[in-house]
Structure formats: structure tokens, C-alpha cells
């Protein structure tokens, strides 16, 4: 380890910045957040530094560097393009055992600035010691996207309660379990993201009381897993999955997504394939509520988006009625994700001015209560979930109500997976084509399907 990572307290500490250009200004911006007393020595100041000086955020102590300027300085930042001058200042500072950073010159640095992820009071610094700055930038971008902005306020809230909880929960092991449960639960982060700070504070207070009285709190998170490819899971979805105590998932959820959960999370398959349910909807609702009431952070993980033909609304009605805290994390619905992976734009100025999503699954026996005339517009794209179930009936009704028999049709199975299969035909051919692919399938009907051959980019076209 060439560099020791440290977090330095600079509040009211004198820091000398040598240089007055834009590079110096960038370092000043970082230093301002620490409360340091920032002194500048430079012949001239760039416009940004002049503005900062006008606001009295920095002190311009001189135009020419003097050795005496190093007196009582905590650290020095050198930001000029004069190599010889930089070397001189560095040597003077080194002799006085003052920490020095010379911008973009690691050989003249006794400390370096890491890439900083600021979720104050939580701070993360990343560095390669100057070996791979582009790689560090990529890592920073990755972490920035994964760490919620709310985590800083959550940490501050925990700091406010830390001593009180220490007084109430004296056993160090139980206290650690308390904090782990509180943070894994995700309720506080959810409330903070909504701006409900008072309720977030109340959750901690209630958690302390519940701990003292041996009561538990739980929650339900409805998460859309996307159409298949685990890369289409949202960042928010990943964050919530990783807080789950129990995951209730459908058959269609990619196992690779389940592998992203905590190792100690209990994963339970609850079915949900058309005409093949391992558990009834009412029993599932009751089971989910029961788990949450036992104090578990329950994630209900569904393929696609939970609110589009996913019965998510029905499940949350039951959860809400039971008085359990819940949240919803949208997912990329199959109609959009699968179409994109098939190279089929659902709208196009030349071919389609609107798109309709419908399901091929009927809740009860009998005919659809569908306005077929509305779907007969040849400038409209129709996307049918679980389309294999009633494809013949759908085809006949569309043709009967004026849809052209040669309207292009796409039948897609295992969409967004590497082994996805796409069959292209026409509306009149749908009856025979539908049995050539495995369930579940997505049907796309409309002239936009003709673009598949031109812009197909993924899988088996």
C-alpha cells in the first residue's frame, strides 16, 4: 500500500494554494466544503477565483510566493504550470514537513486527492495512486449510481440517535443487530427520499420502543425485475433487492437477478405463470402480509413491471389495508424491453402514431370485453402479453373488425435472453405460427414489425 487513506479534519486549518488558474479553483472548491482557511498566492486570479474572493471565501495573500508564507500552514496545494517553480515550492514545504500536493505531478506529492463520492457525512475516496485515473473515474461513476443520495441524511439521523440507542440497548451484540435490521429494512431511506424526515425520525423511535417491547416491524417492496436480461434491472431495484430478508418471486424472474440478493435472504417462488399458479392470489396476499407482520423486509419480485399485467395493484391494496409500509420500484415492462431487443420500435412517424398494450389472458371464461374497432387502426401498434393463449381469437377479431390480413406480426419467445426466438409473419398466419414457439410469448402486431429485418441487433432474428 503506497498511500495510506486518511480523512483529514481541515475546519479552520490554514491551507495554502499556490496558483490562480482554473485548476487551482477546482481544488479550492473541494477545500471550501471542509471549512478550511484558504490562502491564495498567485500573480493573477481567474474569474471564478475572483468571484470566490469577492464572496470572502478565500484570502489572496500575495502575488509573489515567499518562504514565510509556509509558516503555520497545515498543507499546501501547488497548481501552476511552471515545473521549476513547483519543484522549488515542493522542496521548501517538504523540509518543513508540510503535506504537499502538486497537481498532476505524483512525484511531487506527499498526499494525493482521491476521487470523492460525497454523501456527507458518508464519504468514499477511491484512488489508484495515479496509475489508472480513467479506471478510477469509471469506478466512481459506478458507485455514484449505486449509492442513494438519501444515505447521507440516514447516517446523520443515525448519529443523532446513536447515544440514546446506546443507553436503551446496552448489549453491544443486540445493538449491532438493531442497527443492521434498521438499515437493511430500507424504511428510513424510503421516507427520506420522499422528503418525509419527521416520519423517518419516528420510525427510529418506534424501532427502539419495539426493540424494548420485543415487537417487530416489517415492510413490502414491490419490485419490477424487467423482461429477463439482468442488465435491465434498475439501479433502484438492485438496491431494494439487496435489503430483502425474504424475496417472493415469480417463475419468470431471471435466476441471475436472484443471485444479486443477500446470501442470507430467503427466496421463495410463488408461481405466477398464466394458468399455472403455485399459490392463489388471495393466499399469496395473506402470506406476504404475514411475513411483513413478523418484522421481515419482504420484496415481491415480478417480471417486467408490477403495474402492467402483474397484479401489483391488487397486492398493494391488500398490503395497504393491513397497514403495512410499502414502496414500488418500477421495472422495464416486457412490451417495451422485448420489443427493443427484437429491433422493433413500437412507434414510428411512418408506421405507427400510437401503441396499445393488452393481455391475451382472460380472467374468466367467455369473450373479451375489448373494443375491437378501436384496435382496427392500421397506424396503431398492438402489444399482447401472454399472447399465445388466445392468439387465434385475437387474430380473427382484428381481421373481422378491419385490420388488414397482411399486417406484420412478430411472435417473440424468451425475449432479451441470449436464446430469444423471433418469428415474423402476418396476421392471417398467426394461427399456425403461434404454436411454433414456446410459452411465454409476446405478440407485436403492426407495420412497425417490418422494421425488424432492418434494425435487428440482438439474439436470433
Swiss-Prot record:
InterPro entries per record: 4pyrrol_Mease (IPR000878), 4pyrrol_Methylase_sf (IPR035996), 4pyrrole_Mease_sub1 (IPR014777), 4pyrrole_Mease_sub2 (IPR014776), CobA/CysG_C (IPR006366), NAD(P)-bd_dom_sf (IPR036291), Siro_Cobalamin_biosynth (IPR050161), Sirohaem_synt_dimer_dom_sf (IPR037115)
UniProt record, GO biological process: cobalamin biosynthetic process; methylation; siroheme biosynthetic process
Modification Phosphoserine occurs at: 128
Reaction it catalyzes: uroporphyrinogen III + 2 S-adenosyl-L-methionine = precorrin-2 + 2 S-adenosyl-L-homocysteine + H(+); precorrin-2 + NAD(+) = sirohydrochlorin + NADH + 2 H(+); siroheme + 2 H(+) = sirohydrochlorin + Fe(2+)
Pathway: Cofactor biosynthesis; adenosylcobalamin biosynthesis; precorrin-2 from uroporphyrinogen III: step 1/1; Cofactor biosynthesis; adenosylcobalamin biosynthesis; sirohydrochlorin from precorrin-2: step 1/1; Porphyrin-containing compound metabolism; siroheme biosynthesis; precorrin-2 from uroporphyrinogen III: step 1/1; Porphyrin-containing compound metabolism; siroheme biosynthesis; siroheme from sirohydrochlorin: step 1/1
Keywords for this protein: Cobalamin biosynthesis, Lyase, Methyltransferase, Multifunctional enzyme, NAD, Oxidoreductase, Phosphoprotein, Porphyrin biosynthesis, S-adenosyl-L-methionine, Transferase
Binding site for S-adenosyl-L-methionine: 227, 303-305, 308, 386, 415
Gene Ontology MF terms in the entry: NAD binding; precorrin-2 dehydrogenase activity; sirohydrochlorin ferrochelatase activity; uroporphyrin-III C-methyltransferase activity
Gene3D superfamilies per the UniProt record, alphabetical: Cobalt-precorrin-4 Transmethylase, Domain 1, Methyltransferase, Cobalt-precorrin-4 Transmethylase, Domain 2, NAD(P)-binding Rossmann-like Domain, Sirohaem synthase, dimerisation domain, Siroheme synthase, domain 2
Active site: 250, 272
Annotated region described as Precorrin-2 dehydrogenase /sirohydrochlorin ferrochelatase, given as residue ranges: 1-204
Any coiled-coil regions, as ranges: none
Enzyme Commission number(s) of this protein: 2.1.1.107, 1.3.1.76, 4.99.1.4
UniProt cross-references to SUPFAM superfamilies, sorted A to Z: NAD(P)-binding Rossmann-fold domains, Siroheme synthase middle domains-like, Tetrapyrrole methylase
Residues the record lists as binding NAD(+): 22-23, 43-44
Transmembrane residue ranges: none
Region (Uroporphyrinogen-III C-methyltransferase): 218-461
NCBIfam families: cobA_cysG_Cterm, cysG_Nterm, PRK06136.1, PRK10637.1
Family label: In the N-terminal section; belongs to the precorrin-2 dehydrogenase / sirohydrochlorin ferrochelatase family.
Its biological purpose: Then it catalyzes the NAD-dependent ring dehydrogenation of precorrin-2 to yield sirohydrochlorin. Finally, it catalyzes the ferrochelation of sirohydrochlorin to yield siroheme.
Protein name as it appears in the record: Siroheme synthase
Amino acid at each position: 500500500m503506497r498511500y495510506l487513506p486518511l480523512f483529514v479534519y481541515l475546519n479552520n486549518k490554514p491551507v495554502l494554494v499556490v496558483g490562480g488558474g482554473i485548476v487551482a479553483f477546482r481544488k479550492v472548491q473541494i477545500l471550501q466544503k471542509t471549512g478550511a482557511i484558504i490562502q491564495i498566492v498567485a500573480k493573477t486570479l481567474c474569474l471564478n477565483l475572483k468571484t470566490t474572493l469577492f464572496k470572502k471565501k478565500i484570502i489572496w495573500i500575495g502575488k509573489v510566493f515567499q518562504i514565510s508564507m509556509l509558516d503555520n500552514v497545515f498543507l499546501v496545494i501547488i497548481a501552476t504550470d511552471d515545473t521549476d517553480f513547483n519543484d522549488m515550492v515542493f522542496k521548501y514545504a517538504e523540509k518543513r514537513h508540510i503535506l504537499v500536493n502538486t497537481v498532476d505531478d505524483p512525484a511531487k506529492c506527499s498526499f494525493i486527492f482521491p476521487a470523492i463520492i460525497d454523501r456527507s457525512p458518508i464519504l468514499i475516496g477511491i484512488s489508484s495512486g495515479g496509475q489508472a485515473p480513467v479506471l478510477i473515474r469509471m469506478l466512481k461513476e459506478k458507485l455514484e449510481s449505486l449509492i442513494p443520495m438519501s444515505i447521507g441524511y440516514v447516517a446523520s439521523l443515525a448519529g443523532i440517535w446513536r447515544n440514546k440507542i446506546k443507553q436503551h440497548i446496552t448489549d453491544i451484540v443486540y445493538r449491532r443487530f438493531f442497527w443492521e435490521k434498521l438499515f437493511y429494512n430500507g424504511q428510513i431511506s424510503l421516507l427520506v427520499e420522499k422528503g418525509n424526515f419527521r416520519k423517518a425520525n419516528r420510525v427510529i423511535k418506534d424501532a427502539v420502543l419495539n426493540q424494548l417491547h420485543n415487537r417487530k416491524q416489517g415492510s413490502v417492496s414491490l419490485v419490477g425485475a424487467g423482461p429477463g436480461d439482468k442488465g435491465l434491472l434498475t439501479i433502484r431495484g438492485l438496491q431494494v433487492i439487496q435489503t430483502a430478508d425474504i424475496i417472493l418471486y415469480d417463475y419468470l424472474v431471471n435466476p441471475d437477478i436472484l443471485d444479486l440478493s443477500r446470501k442470507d435472504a430467503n427466496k421463495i417462488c410463488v408461481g405466477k405463470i398464466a394458468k399455472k399458479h403455485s399459490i392463489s392470489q388471495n393466499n399469496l396476499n395473506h402470506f406476504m402480509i404475514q411475513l411483513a407482520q413478523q418484522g421481515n423486509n419482504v420484496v415481491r419480485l415480478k417480471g417486467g413491471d408490477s403495474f402492467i399485467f402483474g397484479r401489483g395493484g391488487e397486492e398493494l391494496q391488500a398490503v395497504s389495508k393491513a397497514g403495512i409500509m410499502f414502496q414500488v420500484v418500477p421495472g422495464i415492462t416486457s412490451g417495451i424491453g422485448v420489443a427493443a431487443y427484437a429491433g422493433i420500435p413500437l412507434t414510428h412517424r411512418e408506421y405507427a402514431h400510437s401503441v396499445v398494450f393488452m393481455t391475451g389472458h382472460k380472467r374468466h371464461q367467455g369473450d373479451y370485453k375489448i373494443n375491437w374497432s378501436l384496435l382496427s387502426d392500421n397506424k396503431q401498434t398492438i402489444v399482447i402479453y401472454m399472447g399465445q393463449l388466445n392468439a387465434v381469437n385475437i387474430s380473427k377479431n382484428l381481421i373481422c373488425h378491419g385490420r388488414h390480413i397482411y399486417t406484420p406480426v412478430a411472435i417473440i419467445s424468451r425475449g432479451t435472453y441470449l436464446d430469444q426466438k423471433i418469428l415474423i409473419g402476418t396476421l392471417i398466419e398467426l394461427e399456425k405460427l403461434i404454436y411454433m414457439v414456446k410459452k411465454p410469448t409476446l405478440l407485436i402486431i403492426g407495420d412497425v414489425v417490418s422494421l425488424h429485418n432492418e434494425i435487428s441487433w440482438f439474439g436470433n432474428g
